[in-house]
């Protein structure tokens, strides 16, 4: 086996780690309708499949309804005009898949996704844009089921010490 590359010193990773507590605090200020808890390095596990885990950026409780949800914080940088296409009227697939995975692992009813996008304008000005998305579990039940099915299949390869197919199936 080859040890994975340590990316902890990369500027983008450092920025994301440093920005996360500040973005969490801004979210709390902007959304008094939630109670929020954060425990660093907390690992939450699926009740039936303990190999399905997540480490939340925040746990939310909706005031008045007591609906439980999560907060996911992302920082990203768009380096070209084509990068905006991934954000046009949607969130990128990898972020959506992670949110579905979190709802699967935790049973949450929703996830609030807070994204800070850094970019440079055509005039050369550095800018930041913060976007907020609320993803409801009820709206993505089929996708959560697909994530569960895929995770269980992958884990079967691990427990049976089998190498999975090299070509990924279409999603």
Show the residue positions of the predicted features.
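Accessory terminal regions of nucleic-acid processing enzymes
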Residues: 1-171
